[in-house]
């Protein structure tokens, strides 16, 4: 299998408890010398209305959110099927929340969020 690309949404086997669900790839493609891993953000239809959830509308996803607080890294073998890709604008929206969650952006500067 070729390496997944940043911005692609894949159906991923997250195990018995977390189920098979769509996930957004946020890592860059792995090279042959790299471990075959992808960093992803799971999509959920059960929103908690957290400021770290990103609501993205696409034709290939049910209504729901990407839960940035659940960023994980998985082996490529868990990637089942490519569902589609987010637009540049949608990725920018996810990246903004991801930078806030990871502490690369000051939360006090984000007063309008929530």
List each model region and its residues:
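Conserved functional hotspots at enzyme active or ligand-binding sites that engage polyanionic ligands
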Residues: 1-114
């Amino acid at each position: 299998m070729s390496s997944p690309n940043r911005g692609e949404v894949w159906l991923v086997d997250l195990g018995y408890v977390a189920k098979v669900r769509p996930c957004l790839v946020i890592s860059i493609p792995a090279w042959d010398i790299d471990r075959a891993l992808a960093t992803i953000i799971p999509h959920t239809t059960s929103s908690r209305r957290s400021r770290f959830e990103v609501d993205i509308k696409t034709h290939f996803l049910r209504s729901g959110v990407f839960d940035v607080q659940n960023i994980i890294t998985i082996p490529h073998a868990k990637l089942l099927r490519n569902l589609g890709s987010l637009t540049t604008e949608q990725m920018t929206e996810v990246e903004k929340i991801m930078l806030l969650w990871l502490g690369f952006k000051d939360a006090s500067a984000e007063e309008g969020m929530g």
